[in-house]
Amino acid sequence: MSEDLAKQLASYKAQLQQVEAALSGNGENEDLLKLKKDLQEVIELTKDLLSTQPSETLASSDSFASTQPTHSWKVGDKCMAVWSEDGQCYEAEIEEIDEENGTAAITFAGYGNAEVTPLLNLKPVEEGRKAKEDSGNKPMSKKEMIAQQREYKKKKALKKAQRIKELEQEREDQKVKWQQFNNRAYSKNKKGQVKRSIFASPESVTGKVGVGTCGIADKPMTQYQDTSKYNVRHLMPQ
């Protein structure tokens, strides 16, 4: 599925580039502007579907860490961290620290779940507990945590399925609009006046293929006149 979405994303981006190129010469065309907006929207939807779990984890942790804390962590420290499965914070212990990438491997106390999370998302235990108390949250039991995890995954799957459906509909709409755009680009310039290629077959036996007509289609070519007698000697005074 990810491979298909990646191909679709590349196709949408290519179409957007062509629309932007067309707009450079006709920036007020409403159809092109609407098509550009729709393509940008479907590109964002596709990017969102291709987003990885770490990105979702970082986004879910925004409610837990509104500001980036500054704390010197070391292996064995207790902390409060966000669990990626439900977006809630729990007490954990730091098992390993990757200073280069700014991440820590942690294990949630009482549950045994291991996870790698950015150091900036960790909070001291007391500060984290106070934040949970202020928000009215109570520590969950393991059974409650598993049930919440199951419900979270179910909702996430339903939401993803709905977004995929919307994306497919957007793709079909864009396909039709893009075909209409291409058809207009090669259709007649004015009603009743069809634009013809200069390489089209002539309608009469005297017409020449590849010669611009400029309104004199099917007329004989202008006869060549020999002007060699008008050389420089005729211009010299006698």
From Swiss-Prot:
Q: Which domain of life is it from?
A: Eukaryota
Tissue expression, per UniProt? Detected at intermediate levels in skeletal muscle, and at low levels in heart and pancreas.
Q: Which residues carry this modification: Phosphoserine?
A: S201
Q: Which InterPro entries match?
A: SMN_Tudor, Tudor
A molecular function annotated in GO for this UniProt entry is: RNA binding
Q: Which residues carry this modification: N6-acetyllysine?
A: K219
Q: Which UniProt keywords apply?
A: Acetylation, Apoptosis, mRNA processing, mRNA splicing, Nucleus, Phosphoprotein, Spliceosome
PROSITE patterns linked to this entry? TUDOR
Q: What is this protein called?
A: Survival of motor neuron-related-splicing factor 30
Example GO biological process: apoptotic process
Q: Which organism is it from?
A: Homo sapiens
Sequence similarity: Belongs to the SMN family.
Can you say where in the cell this protein is located? Nucleus speckle; Nucleus, Cajal body
